[in-house]
Amino acid sequence: MELLELISDGTRLDVLLSKDGTLSRSRAADLIREGAVTVNGKVENKPSAKPAAGAQVVLTMPELKPALAEAQDIPLGILYQDAHLAVVVKPCGMVVHPAAGNPDGTLVNALMYHLDQLSGIGGEMRPGIVHRLDKDTSGLLMVAKDDETHKALSDQLSARTMEKHYYAVVAGVMKEQEGVIDTPIARSKNDRKKMAIDPLGRPSRTEWKIVWQEKDRALLDIHLITGRTHQIRVHMASIHHPVLGDPIYGVKNMPHAKRLMLHAYSLRFTHPATGEEMRFVAMPEECFKAE
């Protein structure tokens, strides 16, 4: 069993354990609930607990288990792969990893079929997954094949040295050619399935510029600085330009779209093993059109 020993800085327990990028916040929360964390020698089961500053926090990492997800022969666009990582294109409508209601047909099921190995840090249901895209968002994703690579890529995400760009078709006419949205995001107090602008939320920054604009919509090139859940969708809705096809944050009477008009088209990072700068581009599929 591997031990991770930390000194509390007074923040939430799940936040503390995910700060170095080894674990996602959701994975840290799962381990806390499973009783894998002690605070000053006593088990703490609440991810939201805030140990006093200076308290000793110990995480006992469980032995990695074989992935529970099954390999499935699902078509998958693999742009690049080597012994350490892969870059794939997730189609619109595909869930990233198995969960309640989506036991199969996910990106993870496809990865287990097409790739020779995957990292185990993400847990039994999320092997190889370094970062995610919403079900209805298409585009580029990195996949780690070993734990060392997973940790290094997660560190780049945390340090914001990784560059991610999206194309989004949004409703309305933009008054400026470019802009920055720098407002905190937290889970909605009214609907736990939604995120919302909240002064007490996590810092969130989105940069955008117009690629083209028509009378009732615009295509934006969006640089995602932070990576909060639903960040682009929440931020664009907050300035009254929701992403077309968004069933959660969209508004009535906006132009119709066949799908959520959001695509992760560009990804740049440093290869953990070689130090080489890697950049990948994948243009949207044919259905990425408004009607």
Segments predicted by a language model, with ranges:
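RNA pseudouridine synthases
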Residues: 1-291
